[in-house]
Amino acid sequence: MLGLATTVTLESSGCSSKMCFRLLCSVSSRPARGTFVEDACWVYIISHTFFPFNMTWRVVNIFISLSMDGALMEIGPYRLQDDHTLIYNNGSWDEFANLLFVDQPVGTGFSYVSTDSYVRELGPMADQFVTFLERWFNVFPEYERDDIYIAGESYAGQYIPYIADAIVRRNEKLSANGTSWNVQGLLIGNGWISPLEQYRSYLPFSYKEGVLDKNSDGAKAAESQLSKCMSKLKEVGKFGVHVDECERVLELILDTTKVDGKCINMYDVRLEDTPDACGMNWPPDISLVTSYLRRPDVVKALNINEDKTTGWRECSPGVGRNLQATESVPSVQLLPGLLERGMPIVLFSGDKDLICNHIGTEDLIHNMTWLNATGFELSPDVWAPRHNWEFEGSAAGIYQQARNLTYVKFYNASHMVPFDFPRRSRDMLDRFLGIDITSIGGDPADSRIDGLKGAPTSVGAHPNSTTAEEKEKEKIKIAAWEAYYKSGEVALVVVAIAASLWGFFIWRSKRREKGLEYKGIYPNLESFSSASLATFRGKRRGRMDVESAPRPDEAELETLYNAAEGSDPQDGEENFSDGKGDNEKAQSHAGMGKSR
């Protein structure tokens, strides 16, 4: 599997987390099923869809993510429909990156423990993840020298810095013949990173968004509880990833919204939920994904270890009860060291999330000191400017950057930004990876920063993308039926049009592939593609059924390339895969899933 980026995406949520460590048990891209005596984790890898054949070297990135709700509801290549058919996700992160989804900590998702060996602290969690990666690279040595990016949301704000720090320490202790792992960047969305700033942000955010009336009795009760919270935080000192007295502040805010059998959704304050859930039933796809991942045929297709006796669930009570992190320092204390080592980090926030809201993220940046300056300070009393983003005529958000740290705020987005805006989030990723669409082919997106166009990006618009392929197929289908209505000669017209259009597509795409060269771009010229919130909250109509449209793999693309160069393809060179899957939502308040 060759690619331009392999990204490891980590998921977790308010009820549990998903990330794999300790024992590599089952890998969907390999047919064999592993067997281990103790705990077992589960991983899912999705290879990129585009590879420049004329490249003589491999510039490959691994993107690690915490697991299946991120894969099927956010950044993976497919989304589920109500009838359990799969449709392409126009905005998936696998176009220029290999995605590695990992159920972690052990006990989440498809991973399991055979004893009461749940992880209890963040340090051991990170060490176990390093053990997982070592075993992963033993099985897939072709990936070990790739660039690695680690991404997640919510409680992954704790996981990701700990994992990155553990990898840095592992590299420092390497023997002379060991292979250093190339962690090139971190992306954390609506992250639970600094409990102090996040707990303090609940009331200001609630007042600003109209969730709570500042003069109400509920506000007074919450303000009183916040005072108790601050006292407790002083008592625990540097240890305070989870503080019960502070959790009560959010509970009181939510209690005030329980009216007429409804409660505000803490992950998207524009929405409501049942009073016993207040957002835990969201997003609407979660019940669909759960039932899909419990189907026996899906479990078998995903190569799940037969020792796993319970069905997939988003939140693991066992993990949540045990991962209290009472002796772990909040990950915000690790960020300065990572930034000072030159590691680029992106913190991004959907502005309608309450539980890990953007005010808390902005405050933690403002109060954090790294590289001899505080916050986004460029020099004494001079601060990095906030740049306005505009995409296709609409305001998309803002970004701000200084000293290896980039902050991105997405307008009108929830706790799960890629769920709301898959194309915008993918555009952010492309900017971070340094993808320049002009060197690949495809139509650049109309993306502007402070009214000026930056380096062009495009989501799904280069000729080899799954989106472009589906558009070509749709053109063929429409043209064929128009011919049928005119003449009734269906078979002849379909063959003629399909041959001509597909031949033109191959010719055009292969001409664009000649001389491809990837140019890095400065990541602060990031932009976003548009996809409205309603796009994936509705029924997502008008997309094609992926189960009837297999995707060509690299062998097929190389066959087409050879054909375009005048060589005859050999019989049997075309291979197709019907890969299914991808995710992330901070679970039980943990990594791409719900929070904490």
UniProtKB/Swiss-Prot annotation:
Signal sequence segment = 1-17
User: Which regions face the Cytoplasmic side of the membrane?
Assistant: 508-596
Q: What class of enzyme is it?
A: hydrolase
Chain spans, region Disordered: 447-469, 539-596
Transmembrane stretches in the record are 487-507
| Record's catalysed reaction(s) | Preferential release of a C-terminal arginine or lysine residue
UniProt-listed Enzyme Commission number(s)? 3.4.16.6
Sorted alphabetically, which keywords does the UniProt record give? Apoptosis, Carboxypeptidase, Glycoprotein, Golgi apparatus, Hydrolase, Membrane, Protease, Signal, Transmembrane, Transmembrane helix
Compositional bias, Basic and acidic residues, is annotated for 543-554, 577-587
Gene Ontology CC terms, in alphabetical order:
membrane; trans-Golgi network
How does the record classify its membrane topology? Single-pass type I membrane protein
User: What superkingdom does the record give?
Assistant: Eukaryota
Q: Which residues lie on this side of the membrane: Lumenal?
A: 18-486
Q: Which processes are annotated in GO (biological process)?
A: apoptotic process; proteolysis
- Please give the residues the UniProt entry marks as glycosylated: N54, N90, N177, N367, N372, N404, N412, N464
- Which family is it part of? Belongs to the peptidase S10 family.
Its biological purpose is as follows: Protease with a carboxypeptidase B-like function involved in the C-terminal processing of the lysine and arginine residues from protein precursors. Promotes cell fusion and is involved in the programmed cell death.
Q: What name appears for this protein in its UniProt entry? A: Pheromone-processing carboxypeptidase KEX1
User: From what organism does this protein derive?
Assistant: Arthroderma benhamiae (strain ATCC MYA-4681 / CBS 112371)
Kindly list the organism's lineage: Eukaryota, Fungi, Dikarya, Ascomycota, Pezizomycotina
